[in-house]
């Protein structure tokens, strides 16, 4: 992919790489992964503006870059992942006011124990008809029951990829039961 710098060059590299790997000439839905700007990553609460965060591409320039790939036929629709109500509202507003392509989907976490999507994203998603593509529907496998009573299946995500322990802490495990 093209990294997390959403300009025409890096988006083009990412799209072309995906087209090659998928052995196709177009992508039905191309999604941006993570906002460029600093935001509440990984469930962090209490957003604070980082005045040192550096440059990131404006929402409008991102939509203009994506528009070129829609017009060229490389992608049909666009969406994003891990976005906030602020980010989605900016994209929607610019799409309407500047006749730019609109975000059709947002891919955020949502499951029985992580329902933060309902706080702000659900309203704008429903009102603006921006579909939700859920990730972590089973809370990285914790809701499947395979980690009960301290079990750690050999080839499970938790065994293979360290750093996801926050989903298996004692308080979370009580909620899964």
Task: Show where each model-derived region lies.
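Acidic/hydrophobic-patterned starts of short beta strands in beta-sheet-rich repeat architectures
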Residues: 29-30
């Amino acid at each position: 992919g093209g990294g997390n710098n959403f300009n025409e060059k890096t988006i083009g590299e990412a799209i072309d790489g995906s087209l090659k790997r998928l052995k196709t000439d177009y992508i039905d839905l191309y999604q941006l992964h993570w906002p460029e700007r600093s935001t509440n990553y990984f469930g962090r609460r209490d957003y604070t503006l980082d005045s040192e965060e550096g440059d990131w591409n404006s929402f409008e320039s991102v939509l203009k870059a994506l528009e070129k790939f829609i017009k060229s036929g490389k992608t049909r629709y666009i969406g994003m992942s891990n976005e906030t109500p602020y980010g989605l509202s900016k994209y929607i507003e610019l799409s309407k006011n500047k006749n730019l392509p609109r975000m059709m989907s947002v891919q955020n976490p949502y499951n029985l124990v992580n329902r933060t999507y309902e706080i702000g994203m659900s309203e704008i998603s429903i009102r603006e008809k921006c579909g939700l593509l859920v990730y972590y529907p089973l809370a990285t496998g914790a809701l499947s029951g395979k980690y009960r009573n301290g079990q750690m299946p050999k080839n499970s995500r938790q065994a293979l990829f360290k750093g996801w322990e926050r989903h298996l802490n004692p308080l979370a495990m009580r909620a899964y039961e």
